[in-house]
Amino acid sequence: MEHGSSRGFIWLILFLDFVSRVTGKTQVDALIALRSSLSSGDHTNNILQSWNATHVTPCSWFHVTCNTENSVTRLDLGSANLSGELVPQLAQLPNLQYLELFNNNITGEIPEELGDLMELVSLDLFANNISGPIPSSLGKLGKLRFLRLYNNSLSGEIPRSLTALPLDVLDISNNRLSGDIPVNGSFSQFTSMSFANNKLRPRPASPSPSPSGTSAAIVVGVAAGAALLFALAWWLRRKLQGHFLDVPAEEDPEVYLGQFKRFSLRELLVATEKFSKRNVLGKGRFGILYKGRLADDTLVAVKRLNEERTKGGELQFQTEVEMISMAVHRNLLRLRGFCMTPTERLLVYPYMANGSVASCLRERPEGNPALDWPKRKHIALGSARGLAYLHDHCDQKIIHLDVKAANILLDEEFEAVVGDFGLAKLMNYNDSHVTTAVRGTIGHIAPEYLSTGKSSEKTDVFGYGVMLLELITGQKAFDLARLANDDDIMLLDWVKEVLKEKKLESLVDAELEGKYVETEVEQLIQMALLCTQSSAMERPKMSEVVRMLEGDGLAERWEEWQKEEMPIHDFNYQAYPHAGTDWLIPYSNSLIENDYPSGPR
């Protein structure tokens, strides 16, 4: 009996392994089909070079994220210069939650089969040249929250089936769609900007008891006016020159720019209980951050800026705020809106459920688990992607100037979200000496910025490198407490000394309790040292950092740097020789899937 049970157990294990392999192979086949459709040009082949048809699962491939069951949950191929068409085989990824193929050169139609991706939360196909209709099958995606199809060549009518979806974000503007805008379902919450620059008819007005001729004239007038408003709104969005009248808070209109809103002071006073001290989430050099609850029960974080008011700065403030709002990436804190009165400047963000990396490392409540090593790796990658977007993909480059663990926020699934970007410029929009006014936090400020006051994207790279050391050690970038042990008060200097004299484990946060991979720690230290080189020119760009974190080029860059720096740095790098970067892809055990932040800071 015992022997039979053992044999049955073995067969069960073999069967489960077989099922796993079959499932994995199906996913491999689906992604290879996608690669075949998109593999035009050397750049594409390089982007997808790790996609190997001989693999059992695709979970080790670049730009692919899996869950603990080795099921693909995310494809990250935005802004990858891809061309070709989507393939119906994508439906063979049943656990896919995030499909990101935005800002490429993709043509053809959206496959009907995407409607079979029942776990899909976000579909981002914007800024391509996709044609044909929006498939009505997308209406089956009961978990879809983010649908962004704008800046394509889509035609036909908006499927009525989409109105039943629980959408938080919808943007199908700048296409060739026609017909009526549905008025039922979740569509009612979206402004005209979500549908702008199409051939769509506005939502029908209620019938009037006036004579038929007058009614017809009214309808024509409404339609013409709506069309004019659509065009004007689209122009405002593209040119970033929107202007809101600064009226007293009690009379503030509800003004939207896409999903971006001007809030009234009254509703933010109610949301924060008149900026109650018990709602304070944090205080920084830009102002105080409060937790708030809007009338629809949505949690937000409201930053009450402390900058000095000057006459005539309202339009410039609005322009800068709107510029910040246009930076949309899942690793950037999304600006929901603002409030401006003669006496107040406020910014409204989604509430970040898990606070900041700094608070998770050093201020976590008793009973809350420490950030584990896989999460720390994912935070390193996510924050790098967000900064790279600010530097390379915004209409106007945004330099953060204060990259640190306290400004890397974590949503409910511990996805890293870069916060407070754009505020350095926003708070100095009327300062003629902005180029020489040093901003930042001691311990994170790049040496060239400190000495000259001149910043560049390499200033952010330095701050990012120090933030990596915060992730590894759990310590502050500047800490007078280290003087008690005759250690350097600057984290970067302390790390270098420890590398000279002590073992690697002396650096790693004790909160990890030894649960980390030594080679991975070494590689993140290598990355941090490359990013914090004294010469700004020698530091990598954030886009290069992302590529190295994804497994491309760290070993070569590190070897090159060692040859140049060995006479200067007096510690034995050969004691830590591991240069492999396989782990640096988005880790396959990730449960981090949320596309938009929603919680405290």
From Swiss-Prot:
Please report the residue spans annotated as repeat (LRR): 71-94, 95-118, 119-141, 143-165, 166-188
Catalysed reactions, semicolon-separated: L-seryl-[protein] + ATP = O-phospho-L-seryl-[protein] + ADP + H(+); L-threonyl-[protein] + ATP = O-phospho-L-threonyl-[protein] + ADP + H(+)
The protein's matches in SUPFAM superfamilies, at most eight in alphabetical order, are given as: L domain-like (SSF52058), Protein kinase-like (PK-like) (SSF56112)
Q: Which residues form the signal peptide?
A: 1-24
According to its UniProt record, what is one Pfam family this protein matches? Answer: LRR_1
Recount the PTM note.
Answer: Autophosphorylated.
Give any GO molecular function from the UniProt entry.
protein serine kinase activity
Keyword terms: ATP-binding, Cell membrane, Glycoprotein, Kinase, Leucine-rich repeat, Membrane, Nucleotide-binding, Phosphoprotein, Receptor, Repeat, Serine/threonine-protein kinase, Signal, Transferase, Transmembrane, Transmembrane helix
| InterPro entries per the UniProt record, alphabetical | Kinase-like_dom_sf, Leu-rich_rpt, LRR_dom_sf, LRR_N_plant-typ, Prot_kinase_dom, Protein_kinase_ATP_BS, Ser-Thr/Tyr_kinase_cat_dom, Ser/Thr_kinase_AS
Q: Which GO terms describe its biological process?
A: protein phosphorylation
Q: Where is the Protein kinase domain?
A: 275-572
Q: Which residues carry this modification: Phosphothreonine?
A: 272, 298, 435-436, 441, 452, 532
Q: Which GO terms describe its cellular component?
A: mitochondrion; plasma membrane
Residues on Cytoplasmic side: 237-601
Membrane topology for this entry? Single-pass type I membrane protein
Please, which domain of life does this record's source organism belong to? Answer: Eukaryota
Residues with PTM Phosphotyrosine: 449
- Enzyme Commission code(s) on record: 2.7.11.1
Which residues constitute the catalytic centre?
402 (proton acceptor)
**Where does it live in the cell?**
Cell membrane
Q: Where are the transmembrane segments?
A: 216-236
Q: Where, in this chain's numbering, is ATP bound? A: 281-289, 303
Q: What class of enzyme is it?
A: transferase
Function of this protein? Serine/threonine-kinase of unknown function.
Identification of the protein by name: Somatic embryogenesis receptor kinase 5
